[in-house]
């Protein structure tokens, strides 16, 4: 939508309702929005809300090799559209199979968790963390990560870096 010489799009990086505004003079636009009562968010705040809401980000949580069924982003796939790169494997999984891991949100009883930390259940490695951040709202670290399907159910208990964690 055109607005005051800019383009406004309903896009959310956090999983909450949001907008992206594209324009030539970002400083002037920011000043107008702040004078109208808008409160700017830092990149760190946006990242925290994104992870708290389980919203994956390409490059952090979704990769070139990720399958839509793993990332739980099926709303982004059309099974009625013509050919596209990767269609055969995506359709084969939908029609006959399943994935072995899924991207899930976790809350971890630890102050700091790094990307790449291993997720463990019953003494065996069952996944890894892709994004993690301390959540002031929950008082825990919230994280996104790929976890093997048997441990993906909400409420499943796992460990990350030796700390207790729960899948949501």
Please provide the spans of the model-predicted regions.
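Glycine-rich, small/acidic residue-mixed loop/short-helix segments
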Residues: 65, 71-77, 81-87, 91-168
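A short secondary-structure junction signal
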Residues: 19, 29-33, 61-63, 88, ...
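Acidic, low-complexity central loop/insert segments
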Residues: 1-56
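A near-ubiquitous, low-amplitude feature marking generic local secondary-structure context
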Residues: 34-37, 56, 62-63, 76, ...
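Intrinsically disordered, low-complexity regions
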Residues: 6, 16-19, 24, 60, ...
């Amino acid at each position: 939508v055109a607005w005051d010489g800019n383009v406004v799009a309903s896009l959310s990086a956090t999983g909450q309702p949001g907008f992206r505004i594209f324009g030539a003079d970002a400083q002037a636009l920011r000043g107008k929005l702040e004078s109208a009562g808008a409160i700017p968010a830092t990149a760190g705040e946006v990242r925290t809300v994104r992870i708290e809401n389980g919203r994956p980000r390409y490059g952090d949580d979704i990769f070139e090799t990720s399958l839509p069924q793993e990332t739980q982003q099926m709303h982004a796939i059309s099974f009625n559209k013509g050919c596209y790169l990767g269609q055969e494997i995506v359709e084969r999984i939908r029609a006959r199979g399943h994935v072995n891991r899924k991207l899930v949100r976790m809350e971890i009883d630890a102050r700091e968790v790094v990307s790449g930390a291993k997720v463990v259940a019953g003494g065996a490695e069952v996944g890894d963390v892709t994004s993690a951040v301390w959540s002031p709202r929950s008082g825990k670290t919230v994280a996104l990560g790929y976890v093997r399907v048997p441990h993906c159910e909400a409420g499943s208990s796992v460990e990350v870096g030796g700390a207790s964690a729960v899948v949501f």
